[in-house]
Amino acid sequence: MHNNYDPIARYYDVLSRLVFFRAQVRAQIEQLAFIPAGSTILIAGGGTGWILEEIARIHPSGLRITYVEISAKMLDLSKKRDVKGNQVSYIHAAAEDFGISTVYDVIITAFLFDNFRAEKISLVFGRFHQALESGGLWLFSDFYYNPASGKRWQWYLLKTMYLFFKQISEVEASDLINTEHCFTAALYRPLKTAYYYGGFIKSIVYQKS
């Protein structure tokens, strides 16, 4: 199965911190203050679920969360998290496949789109866009590379990552595709943009018009 992190589920967070220290964690945590109380939230590709506990620190109750993860082992780890009084529905499915039956106030996609080729980015973005309330928030974070920056180390690191994860997790993408054009075309407004790890990680809080 493409983009499935089952083989390294137990070690994924450790690997992330070994390479990126806490940059991936900070990119996500520093967006969470934007989540309104009582929100319905879609988290797609949430990994081991540590984000659920961070959300619960801010909102210990009142949230309804749909947690979608393609890796069964990641999902099992997520179910063990302390979500306090929040209601979480765990769904074992790919982001492009699960049936969306709810309109959400907040969508969270952290390091999800870097797994996809261009056609799947368009597919997943379109589905999630339709599922987000007008005025809703999309908390986006992912790797970022601008060739004009002259930071060749980022290019080499990207190639190494894709080679590794293609072997381990059958990641379908071979190159990082910038997704900002999707949000721009759909008239999203960026409320906050932040960079981490020397600009290699970018997080944006978008608001749907």
Describe these PLM feature segments.
Residues 42-97:
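Class I SAM-dependent methyltransferase SAM/SAH-binding core
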Residues 1-23:
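Class I SAM-dependent methyltransferase Rossmann-like catalytic core
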Residues 122-134:
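A short glycine-rich, Lys/Arg-flanked "PGG" loop and its adjoining helix->strand segment in the class I
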Residues 186-189, 194-209:
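Core SAM-dependent methyltransferase catalytic element
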Residues 21-37:
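Conserved alpha-helix/loop element of class I SAM-dependent methyltransferases that forms part
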Residues 141-186, 193-194:
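C-terminal alpha-helical "lid/dimerization" subdomain adjacent to the S-adenosyl-L-methionine
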